[in-house]
């Protein structure tokens, strides 16, 4: 047995506590921007505290967790770290709003082999920006520096969001019925899904991600931050009887819309009601991807679908467009019989 001639430290093993402290100092002002009045205490405690808003008579907590998937691979490779934090919050908070829940607080998990304070600061500032857009507080998180677990500059992210809904007003799809209208809310791009296929298309087509597409680099189309719909949909819920909402994520139209439909209903989507953003046409062409696979993998320009009574379409569209959304009538709900698919795209 041999003994080192000089004392070993945690830093010698690859964990830099001082770098972690520097990160905390860098993000304090960004985190402060996200604070809600219900939050108790400050950043850095063992457990984060948050009261329930007093306006709820029968509050129900709604939780969600998600990541950014292999979109991170492109962000890391092209050193574009500013927006993946927004993506992380969007993937969680957009899931919560589907139930009609108001996001309350968010926690993040950042794991890497060697902590790069500059990169981590950019990521967490993006998380804070996503929280501001969602109206939720960033109340805590974990930065894990784990030498030997990640190669080079690689890191991974996970997010955890908790929201609250009035028990009697939870949106669960049970009110969906034949004749309801379907409204689409535009996406900002691929959002955070389908990136393993996107990377495969880049590989087989040998395309340069820096090439120009419709006035900006292809990589910027691909890494455009996920649209956060929370505030505009909370406003819509407040003023309209929303029957269901579907966040179009992994699984696309075919998998996500049926998650909020009764068994005896199907969604009839009119594909001529919108034009795909150019990046989806590029992916379809360069990857020789079938239309079915496009709708199963990507959002194809639709980030959220809302079902509500047909006579409320005009007022709902006016509200959403006034809130800054690009929204349109994309189809309707019809009766489903036998073994019919629950999504029909015409």
Curated annotation (Swiss-Prot):
Keywords: ATP-binding, Cytoplasm, Ligase, Nucleotide-binding, Purine biosynthesis. It is found in: Cytoplasm. The keyword Acyltransferase does not apply. One of its GO terms (molecular function) is phosphoribosylformylglycinamidine cyclo-ligase activity. Pfam families: AIRS, AIRS_C. It comes from the Bacteria. Pathway: Purine metabolism; IMP biosynthesis via de novo pathway; 5-amino-1-(5-phospho-D-ribosyl)imidazole from N(2)-formyl-N(1)-(5-phospho-D-ribosyl)glycinamide: step 2/2. Its main location: cytoplasm. InterPro entries: PurM-like_C_dom (IPR010918), PurM-like_C_sf (IPR036676), PurM-like_N (IPR016188), PurM-like_N_sf (IPR036921), PurM_cligase (IPR004733). It catalyses: 2-formamido-N(1)-(5-O-phospho-beta-D-ribosyl)acetamidine + ATP = 5-amino-1-(5-phospho-beta-D-ribosyl)imidazole + ADP + phosphate + H(+). One of its GO terms (biological process) is 'de novo' IMP biosynthetic process. GO terms for cellular component: cytosol. CDD domains: PurM (cd02196). Its EC number is 6.3.3.1. Belongs to the AIR synthase family. This is Phosphoribosylformylglycinamidine cyclo-ligase. The gene is purM.
């Amino acid at each position: 047995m041999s003994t080192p001639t000089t004392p070993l430290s945690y830093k010698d093993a690859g964990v830099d506590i001082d770098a972690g402290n520097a990160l905390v100092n860098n993000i304090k002002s960004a985190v402060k921007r996200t604070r809600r009045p219900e939050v108790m205490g400050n950043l850095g405690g063992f457990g984060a505290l948050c009261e329930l808003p007093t306006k709820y008579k029968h509050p129900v907590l709604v939780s969600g967790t998600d990541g950014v998937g292999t979109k991170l691979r492109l962000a890391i490779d092209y050193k574009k770290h500013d927006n993946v934090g927004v993506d992380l919050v969007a993937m969680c908070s957009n899931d919560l709003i589907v139930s009609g829940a108001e996001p309350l607080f968010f926690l993040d998990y950042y794991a890497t082999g060697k902590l790069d304070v500059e990169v981590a600061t950019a990521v967490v500032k993006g998380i804070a920006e996503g929280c501001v857009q969602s109206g939720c507080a960033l109340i805590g998180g974990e930065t894990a520096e784990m030498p030997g677990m990640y190669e080079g500059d690689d890191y991974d992210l996970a997010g955890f969001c908790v929201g609250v809904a009035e028990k009697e007003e939870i949106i669960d799809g049970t009110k969906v019925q034949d004749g309801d209208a379907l409204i689409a809310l535009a996406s900002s791009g691929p959002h955070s899904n389908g990136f393993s296929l996107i990377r495969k298309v880049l590989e087989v087509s040998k395309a340069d991600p820096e090439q120009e597409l419709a006035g900006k680099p292809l990589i910027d189309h691909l890494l455009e931050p996920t649209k956060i719909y929370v505030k505009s949909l909370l406003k819509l819920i407040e003023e309209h009887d929303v029957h269901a909402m579907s966040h179009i994520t992994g699984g696309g139209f075919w998998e996500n819309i049926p998650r909020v439909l009764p068994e005896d209903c199907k969604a009839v989507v009119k594909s001529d009601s919108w034009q795909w953003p150019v990046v989806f046409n590029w992916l379809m062409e360069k990857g020789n991807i079938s239309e079915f696979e496009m709708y199963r993998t990507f959002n194809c320009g639709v980030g959220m679908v809302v079902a509500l009574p047909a006579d409320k379409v005009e007022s709902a569209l006016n509200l959403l467009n006034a809130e800054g959304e690009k929204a349109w009538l994309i189809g309707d709900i019809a009766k489903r019989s036998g073994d019919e698919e629950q999504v029909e795209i015409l």
